[in-house]
Amino acid sequence: MNEEVKKNEQFMEVLPAADIIDDEKSAIISLEVPGANAQTVTVEVKDQILSMEARSSLTWHGMQLLYKRSFQLSDAVDVENISARTQDGVLTVTLPKSERAKVHRIQVQ
C-alpha cells in the first residue's frame, strides 16, 4: 500500500492509495481503509470535491489511524446518485455519470 502519513495530536493521518476504474456509466474509486467500517466512514461532496474520511480501529505508535482522501469531480458525475460501501477494509465509492456525459452516437448518412 502506497500511503502518505501525517501526524496530528490525536490521529495518524494516512493518505490511502486509490484504485480508479472508469467506464461509460460510472467511475469506481476503491481505497484500502483497514479497521474502518460504515459507522466510522464519512463521504461528502462540496463544491465538486469528493472528500472521504475513515477512522480506523487500528493504531500505529499509540495513535489511531485516520484515512483521508479527496478528489476533484468533473461535471460529468451525477453527484445526487453517488454511493459508498465498506467491505473487508475497502471503501468503494461509485460515481455514476450524468445522462449528458454519456456518449450519444449519431448516425452519419
Where do the model's predicted regions map?
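Alpha-crystallin/small heat shock protein
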Residues: 1-109
